[in-house]
Structures are given as structure tokens and as C-alpha cells.
């Protein structure tokens, strides 16, 4: 009798298991395809696929409040950088919502490659899985490295530059966006004894060094940012994203509105 009950319970779970597996396969197929699509040089079929698999919300923080707005400026909306092939082990499906971690291999101003990590959320609408939000994901933080709180807001970085962990040069940031706009945290090494804005204006490669970036951090989101161990000297946090409260979301860059901050490592 007990064996019969267990068998019936097991068989009753099969449809749920199959449904879950099918949903995971469907989501992963969409994400894999979306990761490969680029704007400039992309095919019409690829662009159509992209538009069919995003919600109005997906690009709203970048000045495209609807899918139709994205379609009208498709190459710029999608961009020219494909994502790395996704890994299925990071995929989680819960009903009509799914999340997955994706990454992009980028090149720094010095020519070095680095990884950007993103958390992508998809929703199922009318039987179709669509990208709904994308925000910066967590970096792997080495054991023994402390997290220093860093809040993003309009238009400032909130943290304690006198924190002994920052002064030591061995730390990572736990970033939280407490504002209403999308922000980023770009970490720079100021190598010359001159104002940061002056060095940026001259674009002197010997004056400022790029160390990392966490982007985009959408309102209400948080992310852990790994940082290389810093030597003694001046460093800066800066946000280059445009003021999204301006018409079309293309206002002046946040740093021009005050979102720049310096700290020193001893």
C-alpha cells in the first residue's frame, strides 16, 4: 500500500518537473539568443527578435520608455556589445518570473579586458519570456576582504572616506542605489597632482587610471564590487551617466552635477 502511494505521488510530480524543465529551457534559449544580438550590423530578424522579447520597462531607464521607442532607434537602443554566452546554473525560474546572471567582456581604456556582471530578470507575458530589468550583479569577493558600504543617490556618493578599511587599500564596496535614477560607480586612480576635472579634460592617460566600474545600478538594487588592492595615493569615484530627469533622459552627466568623490589610501 505504502509503495503504491509513493509511486502515485512520484508520478504526480512528473508533470510539474517537466513543466519546470521546459520553462528553464525556454528562458535559457531566449537569454542565449538575446545575448548574441547587437544593434549596429545586426540583422532585421535579430532586431525583431529583440523587440519581441523585451518589456516596455527593459530600456526605460536609458531613455526608451516603450518598445516602440527602442524600435525607432534600434541600433543605439541595443548597443554594439554582445553579452558572453550565459551559464544555465545561474538560472532560477519561479512561475512567470525568472532570473539569471549574465556577463560581458569589456576593454578598459588601457586595453585590458575585464568582466561586467549583470542580474537579468525576465517575465512571461502572453506565453513569451521577455527581459524586464537588468542591473549590476555581484563580483566574487576574495576571502578576508571586508565590504565597505557605498550609497548612490542624486547626485552624490555616500560613504566614509576615513574608514580604516579604505585607508588600508584592501577592501570591496557594497553598493546600494538609494536614489530614483540609474547610477554607476567608476573607480579611478589619480596619478598626477592636479584636479581630477582638469586631468579628465586633458585626457592625459598618465594622469588618470581606470580601475573598475559597476553599472548599471538601478534604483533599489545593490551589488558587490571587487577592487584590486590599492597602493598609496589619490582615488576617485565618478558617475558618467546622464541626468535621466531631463527631457529624453539625456541631461548632463551626473559628475557635472556633483556626483564625484575623492578618497586617499595611506
Locate the predicted segments by residue.
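Bacterial N-terminal signal peptides
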Residues: 8-16
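Short beta-strand edge/turn micro-motifs at domain boundaries
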Residues: 115-143
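Short, well-ordered alpha-helical segments enriched in acidic and aromatic residues
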Residues: 42-71
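Surface-exposed, charged secondary-structure patches
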Residues: 70-113, 119, 137-138
Amino acid at each position: 500500500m505504502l509503495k503504491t502511494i509513493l509511486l502515485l505521488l512520484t508520478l504526480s510530480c512528473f508533470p510539474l518537473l517537466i513543466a519546470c524543465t521546459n520553462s528553464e529551457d525556454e528562458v535559457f534559449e531566449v537569454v542565449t539568443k538575446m545575448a548574441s544580438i547587437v544593434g549596429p550590423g545586426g540583422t532585421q530578424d535579430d532586431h525583431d527578435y529583440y523587440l519581441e522579447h523585451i518589456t516596455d520597462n527593459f530600456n526605460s531607464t536609458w531613455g526608451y520608455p516603450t518598445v516602440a521607442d527602442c524600435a525607432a532607434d534600434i541600433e543605439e537602443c541595443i548597443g554594439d556589445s554582445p553579452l558572453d554566452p550565459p551559464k544555465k546554473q545561474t538560472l532560477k525560474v519561479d512561475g512567470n518570473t525568472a532570473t539569471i546572471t549574465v556577463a560581458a567582456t569589456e576593454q578598459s581604456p588601457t586595453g585590458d579586458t575585464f568582466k561586467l556582471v549583470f542580474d537579468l530578470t525576465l517575465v512571461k507575458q502572453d506565453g513569451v519570456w521577455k527581459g524586464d530589468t537588468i542591473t549590476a550583479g555581484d563580483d566574487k569577493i576574495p576571502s578576508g576582504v571586508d565590504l565597505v558600504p557605498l550609497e548612490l543617490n542624486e547626485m552624490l556618493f555616500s560613504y566614509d572616506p576615513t574608514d580604516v578599511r579604505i585607508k588600508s587599500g584592501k577592501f570591496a564596496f557594497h553598493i546600494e542605489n538609494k536614489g530614483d535614477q540609474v547610477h554607476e560607480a567608476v573607480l579611478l586612480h589619480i596619478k598626477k597632482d592636479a584636479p581630477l576635472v582638469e586631468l579628465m579634460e586633458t585626457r592625459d592617460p598618465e594622469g588618470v587610471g581606470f580601475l573598475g566600474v559597476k553599472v548599471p545600478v538601478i534604483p533599489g538594487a545593490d551589488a558587490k564590487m571587487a577592487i584590486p588592492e590599492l597602493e598609496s595615493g589619490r582615488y576617485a569615484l565618478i558617475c558618467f551617466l546622464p541626468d535621466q530627469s531631463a527631457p529624453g533622459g539625456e541631461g548632463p552627466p551626473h559628475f557635472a552635477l556633483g556626483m564625484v568623490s575623492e578618497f586617499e589610501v595611506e
